[in-house]
Design a protein with these regions (language model features):
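Short, polar loop motifs at secondary-structure junctions
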Residues: 35-41, 54-57, 201
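Generic structural signal for residues in well-ordered beta-strands
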Residues: 49-51, 65, 196
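Core dinuclear metal-dependent hydrolase active-site scaffold
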Residues: 1, 19, 53-111, 208-210
Length: 210
């Protein structure tokens, strides 16, 4: 139930990530965690009454939250590593690359929710304007299927149970391409099968328990 949601984490201010926030906050009053820079960018758009600054790692009850700076053409953008006991989850989407300084923190986590935005060939042969294609491929754009899979091959470990490929472009990707790219790279690198799921933009996934 929406009323049971007491905490929201905002990664960045692009419309596809915050379009429902204003409506939700008119009816409910959860704590909203975001960076101060991002809050300032949204002040004229959304009335956030219960704002909590998100500037560094912290603990929320029994949940440790690590903040990862991502590289995206937004007012500010972040990803997260959530830890509770022996379980952990990485959430990274909307980034052109991942800074190497975070690699050790990101390794061998239980679940990865990871951007696999586009197939480069589909993007370059598609109908997007050239400047938009350049933006998507830039260091402040999005991870392609190949980039995402390369990162995941170097990060996942024996404790990893699930990989969820997320933020797929409906114009420049397919579920099959994203999935098969990762499967192929896991096989090449002799990494045992993990449970690989692909998130849909229009359908809610089942709950994952670890």
């Amino acid at each position: 139930m929406p009323s049971s949601i007491d905490t929201i984490f905002i990664t960045h201010d692009h419309k596809d990530h915050i379009s429902a926030l204003n409506v939700f906050l008119k009816k409910y009053n959860p704590k909203v965690y975001m960076t101060s820079k991002l809050k300032r960018a949204l002040d004229n758009k959304i009335n956030i009454k219960n704002f909590v600054p998100l500037e560094s790692d912290f603990t929320l009850e029994d949940l440790k939250v690590n903040v990862i700076k991502t590289s995206h053409d937004a007012s500010d953008s972040v990803g997260f590593v959530f830890e509770s006991g022996k379980s952990s989850l990485v959430y990274i989407t909307d980034t052109g690359y991942i800074n190497v300084k975070y690699f050790e923190l990101l390794k061998n986590r239980s679940i990865y929710i990871f951007e696999s935005n586009h197939d480069v060939e589909m993007l370059m042969n598609g109908k997007y304007r050239y400047d938009l294609k350049v933006r998507i491929l830039s260091d402040r754009g999005h991870l392609s299927n190949d980039m995402s899979s390369d990162y995941l091959v170097s990060l996942i470990g024996k404790n990893t149970k699930y990989v969820v490929l997320a933020h797929l472009s409906e114009e420049n990707n397919t579920v099959e391409k994203a999935y098969q790219t990762l499967v192929n790279k896991l096989e090449i690198n002799h990494i045992e099968d993990k449970k690989i799921l692909v998130a849909s933009q229009s359908e809610v996934m089942n709950m994952i328990e670890i």
